[in-house]
Amino acid sequence: MPFSENLIPLSEKKLIYGVKDKPGIFVKAFPFITTNKNDILMEIELQNIGAHLGLSPPILNTYEDQQHYYIVMKRIKGMSLADYYGENKMDIPNWVWKELHRIIRELFINGIEYIDITPYNFLIEDETEKIYVVDYGHAKKVHMNWFVQDFLNGIKQWNPDFA
């Protein structure tokens, strides 16, 4: 059980922890009693896709003990949009909304429908103001039509299936 004895709670509700003497990582815990392991594995798979696209913190490791499944992630030096700007949608700058639309669109183009769009699920990095999406618990895989995907990626032609 690496890290278990060194976990520092960052959030009571979400079971998010820092790790003593390891400032570059954080841990998300899933209690087995309330979470289906297949749902956890799907969340890991979807976040790995997001990380590959540069939209989410990379998952560094996973492990489990008798009560929890843990996801160990790179810690983003920043805070949630809720902590940075507050919860009021009117206080969120236009550039942030544009970036959120781009992120959700990019995920969708890559087969992920991300619906948990709240200021708590997006982190803004301190130095670069890059925005990351986290918490893929309500996300799901979607299959996009090959032509629609190509079209959204910039192809300039009509759908040959309907020509």
Q: Positions of the model-derived regions?
A:
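ATP-binding glycine-rich loop module of kinase domains
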Residues: 4-41
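Short beta-strand micro-motifs within the conserved protein kinase catalytic domain, predominantly
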Residues: 58-69
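C-lobe/activation-segment region of protein kinase-like
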Residues: 125-163
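A short glycine-rich, hydrophobically flanked beta-strand micro-motif that places a catalytic Asp/Glu
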Residues: 60-62, 113-126
